[in-house]
Amino acid sequence: MSPKRLLCAAALCLSFAAAGALAQTAAPTAEPAAEPADMPGMESSAPEAPEPPAAPAAMPATPAAVPTPAAPKATAAKAPAAPMTGPVRNVVLVHGAFVDGSSWNGVVAKLQQKGYHVSSVQNPLTSLADDVAATRRVLARQDGPTILVGHSWGGVVITEAGANAPNVAGLVYVAAIAPDLHESTMDLMKRAAPAPAGQAITADSTGFLWLDRSKYHADFAADVPENLTRVLSAAQQPISARAFSETVSQVAWREKPSWYIVTTRDRAISPEVEQFMANRMGAKIVPISSSHLVPVSHAGAVADVIDRAARELSRQQ
């Protein structure tokens, strides 16, 4: 057989095979296709079968009706868990940026002397979500009603973490950022001229912010002994720069009684901004003549505010 005839036969064979496959796909109930005849030039012991009559054209399949999507079922909104009752004897403390949980040491000691069960959260400061998760882990370990306290950036954390938390009886903001719904730290800081401490913050190559050690005392902790501020600045924890632009999706102070300590000599958060936030949330305001690091410089006064808040909440239970 000539090469030309062989190529034509091969093409014809492939066309049959493709048509057979297409028929099987389009009409699964059709009879299996007959075995292909021997290619021309190939020996066969069986007599050549007569060519079958052409099959009638298949009727086009009726397209399946597209099911009408079921109407969504109305679901009742999940009711918030009932708040716990009883005396408030648990305190959870949430630190801010450029410090760690040890910044609460003096407050912890004072509250323990008053008989409270105190826990100090160690925030990773990697994002708002991470800090909220760390705080909620500590809250989950509390047995009974709890007062949640945040300093500085910790105010953003307790605003989110304290919402819909049945064991959180109330909130204390200590020179803290208190955002409203979908509001960020940066949104609030823009309400006043840049604070001196803001000019001392620098970013590293990984996107974390640090407070200049040489300005830590003057701009962050002016009423803390210098030897202690050197230790604090050496142990400072940086915060992710993106955290200051993250917004809250829940607002605890809208559903919980709140207190606010305004630090009148603050060089990190403007006292005017603190006063604005405290007034907006309807908090009970306690001014203290202090630098931003009031949990260190006035640990006793801060502990007294927390104690008074806990006692008042206990009377309301």
Provide a role label for each language-model segment:
Residues 167-168, 172-213, 240-244, 277:
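Flexible "cap/lid" loop of the alpha/beta hydrolase fold
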Residues 83-128, 167:
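Conserved HGGG/HGGXW glycine-rich cap/lid loop of the alpha/beta-hydrolase fold
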Residues 18-20:
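N-terminal signal peptide c-region/cleavage motif recognized by signal peptidases
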Residues 264-296, 308-309:
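Conserved loop-alpha-helix segment in the C-terminal half of the alpha/beta-hydrolase fold
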Residues 23-86, 315-317:
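Compositionally biased, proline/threonine/alanine/serine-rich low-complexity intrinsically disordered stretches
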Residues 231-252:
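Active-site nucleophile elbow and catalytic-triad environment of alpha/beta-hydrolase enzymes
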Residues 149-154, 158:
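Gly/Ala-rich beta-loop-alpha elbow adjacent to hydrolase catalytic centers
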Residues 260-262:
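Short beta-strand/loop motif that positions the catalytic acidic residue
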